[in-house]
């Protein structure tokens, strides 16, 4: 079977009715618990494909996905699909079918580019779990761990990049360390993991991924920034590194601004 057909089948799994039911059920709960605010959607492209590039927070829970999706669908409705790139572990066993139906697709450049070309909006967290488990004491640092594939995806699909930043998710518990050195010693790279994070939270206290602690009701604010047309800003043959540096710089400036507005940990 050809790759385009595989890509099409993966995108075709999206079920707007199921997605709406999930968002309607879980969205208000998450919004109240995290006192969520999503800003800047008024400048979001009104139609067509767009690649939303965001920092990732909250460890295993990563509430930023649900919070952004709920705000996105409130504004644009369910005629416009929002796909989120996910780790391969989400597509194993019975989870695979459910993942596709609510818009999760594999973190694969070809699949993402096809979604963008068909007019879908794609949400990507280039830093992945490396970012979502960053220490709380460095929570306001945009760190993609050198990953630049998102830039190539946007260029291949001729889609604008919409940078987005969120703050507060790393206060849902105390993220102590990614545990990269320990993961290396234990040879976890064979299992496609470069980290073995240590966190402190409620009710289990210290946790190494499991048992999963409950998230504190930290206030999470997400800011969508102005869309960036890569060709218009960087020309027809942009340097991937230059684009990545610029995107992260724009995001870091916005995250610094949100950090200055935040008065207290957890409370916001």
Place the predicted regions along the sequence by residue:
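Short, well-ordered coil/turn elements that cap or connect secondary structure elements
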Residues: 31-33, 79, 156
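Pocket-edge structural micro-motifs
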Residues: 40, 54, 70, 86, ...
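A generic local structural motif
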Residues: 36-39, 71, 109-110, 209
């Amino acid at each position: 079977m050809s790759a385009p057909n595989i890509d099409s089948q993966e995108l075709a799994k999206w079920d707007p009715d199921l997605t709406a039911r999930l968002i309607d059920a879980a969205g208000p709960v998450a919004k109240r618990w995290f006192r969520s605010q999503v800003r800047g959607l008024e400048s979001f492209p009104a139609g067509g494909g767009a690649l939303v590039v965001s920092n990732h927070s909250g460890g295993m829970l990563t509430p930023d996905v649900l919070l952004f999706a709920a705000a996105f669908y409130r504004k644009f409705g369910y005629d416009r699909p929002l796909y989120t790139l996910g780790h391969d572990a989400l597509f194993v066993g019975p989870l695979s079918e459910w993942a596709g139906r609510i818009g999760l697709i594999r973190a694969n450049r070809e699949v993402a580019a096809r979604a963008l070309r068909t007019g879908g909006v794609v949400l990507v967290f280039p830093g992945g779990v490396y970012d979502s488990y960053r220490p709380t004491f460095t929570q306001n640092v945009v760190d993609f761990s050198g990953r630049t594939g998102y830039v190539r995806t946007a260029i291949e699909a001729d889609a604008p990049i919409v940078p987005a930043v969120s703050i507060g998710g790393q206060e849902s518990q105390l993220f102590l360390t990614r545990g990269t050195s320990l993961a290396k010693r234990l040879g976890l790279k064979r299992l496609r993991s470069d980290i073995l994070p240590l966190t402190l939270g409620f009710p289990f206290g210290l946790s190494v991924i499991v048992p999963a602690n409950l998230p504190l009701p930290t206030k999470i604010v997400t800011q969508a920034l102005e869309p960036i047309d890569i060709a218009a800003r960087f020309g027809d043959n942009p340097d991937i590194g230059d684009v990545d540096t610029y995107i992260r710089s724009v995001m870091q400036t916005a995250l610094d601004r949100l950090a200055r507005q935040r008065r207290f940990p957890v409370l916001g």
